[in-house]
Amino acid sequence: MKRTPLFEKHVELGAKMVDFAGWEMPLYYTSIFEEVMAVRKSVGMFDVSHMGEFLVKGPEAVSFIDFLITNNFSSLPDGKALYSVMCNENGGIIDDLVVYKVSPDEALMVVNAANIEKDFNWIKSHSKNFNVEVSNISDTTALIAFQGPRAQEALQELVEDSLEEIAYYSFKKSIVAGVEAIVSRTGYTGEDGFELMIEAKNSPKVWDALMNLLRKIDGRPAGLGARDVCRLEATYLLYGQDMDENTNPFEVGLSWVVKLDKDFVGKEALLKAKEKVERKLVALELSGKRIARKGYEVSKNGERVGEITSGNFSPTLGKSIALALVSKSVKIGDQLGVVFPGGKLVEALVVKKPFYRGSVRREV
């Protein structure tokens, strides 16, 4: 299994390590519950260095990325980041990603850990007609997420530039704990917070400095368990569970990242798909505390209407919650049933998304 440059730090902290997409990653340090609560009330710090980073440089960097992704990258100012998906020619989602516009001829793409090789090959295969150079810098790049309502006040102590001046989905090159870093106001938890992109060799030093901050504010290092709970509570999608190459953006509530007034890979397929959307992703609150797993059948009045894509117990809400891909006829307020192993039917209410709205800044 692969290890991030912060692996030894996790071991020192006594983390429970697990295999995630071929990476040995911390599931939790003390408990998922405590780590979720730290994110919601103070700060949780995540090692997300398993994520992939690609550098795109060249005079046609912007137009190239605009061709690859569904969202509009060409109109983005320097210093801003953008959430989007990449689709194949059939309109299926290859990956969801965040793209950073550094300058008119330089951009950074951050992709999911499980898709690094697939994405890089896909991107390279489409680069031949553009004057660009694409580099996979994942192995030399570390990424640390510092997330929670107290993230700004705590982190400011270590950052040379004003964090207040970094707007939501914006970033700045700065110095953090004496180390060069890209500091972005982005995250995957539903809270305000920052992600720090640094050279892998410098990451242990930055991690230690951040740990010292956490001790002052009752913050905690947090593992992938808490990350999954937080993202589900905030109703952020997880690639490979809530979406994949067999789903299109319209089915999973991502129509807002599809800009059909420009050209991109998969546009023709998505123009057709938009006219005949038969499924949608809905939020469910289940009775009791049992956790619905991916693939569990979802029924309405005894008839199958879809299946669970993600499920977990929400410590913040004190409820079992899930996302499900179901028939478009299902609506908020409907009572559905989730079929658990052994045939037990658990009641589930379709609720408005998101389950939880935290301190994340909404202005873009």
Curated annotation (Swiss-Prot):
Enzyme Commission number, as recorded: 2.1.2.10
Gene3D superfamilies, A to Z: Aminomethyltransferase beta-barrel domains, Aminomethyltransferase fragment, Probable tRNA modification gtpase trme, domain 1
Instruction: Give the SUPFAM superfamilies listed for this entry.
Output: Aminomethyltransferase beta-barrel domain, Folate-binding domain
What reaction does this catalyse?
A: N(6)-[(R)-S(8)-aminomethyldihydrolipoyl]-L-lysyl-[protein] + (6S)-5,6,7,8-tetrahydrofolate = N(6)-[(R)-dihydrolipoyl]-L-lysyl-[protein] + (6R)-5,10-methylene-5,6,7,8-tetrahydrofolate + NH4(+)
GO CC terms of this entry: cytosol; glycine cleavage complex
- What Gene Ontology molecular-function terms does this entry list? aminomethyltransferase activity; transaminase activity
Q: Which Pfam families does the entry link to?
A: GCV_T, GCV_T_C
Name a single GO biological process: glycine decarboxylation via glycine cleavage system
Q: Which cysteines are joined by disulfide bonds?
A: none
* Entry keywords, A to Z: Aminotransferase, Transferase
Q: Which InterPro entries match?
A: GCS_T, GCS_T_bac, GCST_C, GCV_T_N, GcvT/YgfZ/DmdA, GcvT/YgfZ_C, TrmE/GcvT_dom1
Function statement: The glycine cleavage system catalyzes the degradation of glycine.
- NCBIfam families referenced in this protein's UniProt entry, alphabetically: gcvT, PRK00389.1
Subunit structure as annotated in this protein's UniProt entry: The glycine cleavage system is composed of four proteins: P, T, L and H.
The family annotation for this protein states: Belongs to the GcvT family.
Give the protein's recorded name.
Aminomethyltransferase
Say which species the protein is native to.
Answer: Thermotoga sp. (strain RQ2)
Q: Which gene encodes it?
A: gcvT
